[in-house]
Structures are given as structure tokens and as C-alpha cells.
Amino acid sequence: MLREITNFVRILPPNNMRRILLLICLFVILVTPAVAQLYQYLDTQNGLSSRRVLSIRKDKKGYMWFLTHEGIDRYNGKQYTHYSLTANGKLLNFFPNLNTLQIDTAGVVWEIGKTGHLFKYNSLQDKFELVCDFANKDKSNSGLPLTASFLDSKDNNILLCTKNKQYLFDIDTHELIQLESPIKEEITYIAKSTNNQYFLASSHKIYCTRLNHGRLEVIKHPELDNFHIVNYIYFHPETQMLVIGTLLDGIYLYNIHSRQLIDVHNGLQDINVNSIIASKENENEVLIATNGAGVYKLNLCTYELTNF
């Protein structure tokens, strides 16, 4: 390539300085790696069904899925496809019944609704199919709506919670069972740590549990017994830390092995946490999205909290 550029420069009029400058410029363009980050603003003007987005997922093809107040949108980078949800021949009202999008081990997109309807995307027919109607499967007093859900992509099941009960849905067999459990209060957030261990959070307490053959066994962690309005929990595998967001007292970190509870100073007091995810740039950091206060970066080793 450089030889071709040199030959091209030689055919120019005899001006040595101009030849040299052109050669240098073209060479720099070719050998310098181009590093660019592309951002695209997506809104209702180019196809998004609503500006109120409840959940976002990226599938194995790279398509983006959005759960909004108006339904489910898939964006392939060029255009949107809108999907409706139908149960028993009736079109479901999207808000406030919708809850979250999840992706299983096979890369299939699921929609888990607060009304107990579980939908699975059928790529062959390009539509969402109802695979579980919670109210029909559980004839007892189920206590709907669902208050929390967690799709475990490793074990291919979905942990579901109602007002005072917990259930397990098998993604492969579509079997729904009520778990034997001593927990009789409303669970609002779920995080999985290692093996069959789950953390279940109510508004003021976090339960450490082990799933064992249809039973939830509570493992006592007194350090997790008293919080002021838990609004999010997230388990970070690399550091073995449970990140706890509370509305009144801010952010806490809990080491599940040493059982040390750490209060993160200046940790977002009186701010609601919407989501916590692992950072792709640093394995010891998480990103915390808030409701109205922006995004923060938290180092789980130094406990340093900074604006992102």
C-alpha cells in the first residue's frame, strides 16, 4: 500500500515539499488506528413506542429490546418492530402490568409481567407466546401481582415472588412449583450469589437463602436484618460483594464471606437506585443508575464513589 502511495505521489508536478507532505499525511491516515465510540439517540420520532422505558436487553444477535409503557420494541440498528402480548385471546394492557425483560441460557427473550403472565419470544414465528399463566397454574391464593422475579440463566429457571410466597418456574419443562419457605413477607428484589444461594430483599430486611429440592432454607446473617427501605440489591461475583441500595441511608457493601457490612460514605442518601450493573472497564467496579441523579461508579475494593 505504501508503494502505491509513493508511485501516486511521483506523478504529481515536481514539487518536492508538496510530495513529502502528501506522503506523510496519507501514511499517517493508513497506519493510525481509528478509535471511535458511536452513540445514537433513540426516541419516539424514529420508532420507539414510548419514552418511558421499563427494561432493556441485548440479544445474541446484537438486537436491542425495549419494554416500554406501550409494549415491546425490537431495534435492529435500522428499524423497530413492535410486539403485542395476548393472553387467552385478549390483548393485554401494557401498563402497569408489564415488569421486565430477561434472556435465558439459549439467548431467548422473556417478558415477565406483574400479572403472572410469562411470555417467550418465538423467533420462527416472530412473536411472543404465553408459556405460563400464573393464576391458572396456581389455584391457591397466589397473592398476585408478582412483587419480584429473577431469571437464573445458569440453572434455567425463574424465581418468582408474590406478597408472601415464593415460586420456581422451570424454563425447560414449564413446571411451576410453590417453594416451601419460612419467608412470609413481601419480597421486592432478588440477587443470586454462588451455586443455589439467593438473596431476597424486603423493604427492611435481606434474607440469605439456599434453594434445596423445592425448599428455600434461610441462612442467618444478622448483619442484614435492619435497613431503611431497600431499593435495590446486586451481587458482584468477582469481589463476592452484595451491593445494597437503600433510600434513606444510601449504599452498603456486604462481604458474604467475612460478613462485614460496609457503609459507603456519601453513598447516595435519599436517592432511589434504579439499577446496578458490572463495569466492563474494571472488574472491581459497578455502575449505579439512579432516579434523577445520574450514574455513579463504585469501586468495591476502595469503596470510592464517583460520578460516571
Regions found by a protein language model. Give the residues of each.
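Carboxylate-rich, polar loop motifs that coordinate divalent cations or form catalytic acidic clusters
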Residues: 1-308
